[in-house]
């Protein structure tokens, strides 16, 4: 059985199918990309995985055990963490206290939570901001704090949602380096990203979706050259010319 598996999931809001019959598998140690136009269902898939949205149908498995039907905190305890597209740190708390708060999802012992937070901050290269208020951080550091908070829950599988949005070219390179560093530390990653430089550089495989349905899966090169993917992003006219 795959390390992580989504089997025929669907999420309906009334009569609208935000996600419909989506299936994929992720192997341990992989960076697996999710791409698609705006409102194609990518973040909804993340919300279904983490039980922010209950599934309309389908099942989700992690390490051979069914996690669909569990509550969000239970899924986190199993080792599935995530970041959010819109970062919302605890603005009136320091970076360290933000990360400690997340570490308490992994341990209830304060000394262990503090130690875990400090090590995670060092891993993510935020030590210089440790004692600063979260609201004072520049956007790139806020994005990195979001990742740091997620890592403090000690995930084995991490869902990254638009981590690179709003970053300049040098910050993008730093974000890519951090994602690879997380992968090299043993964390399996599923990433939603619009910036093709990021997704094509780091992903082992990519799943493309449109209107909540799978349109392609394969290597970055295979997906980038797929007719349906080109049409979804650039339109029929461009696809016909290519």
Q: What is each PLM-predicted segment?
A:
Residues 2-5, 9-242:
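Glycine-rich phosphate-binding loops of nucleotide-dependent enzymes
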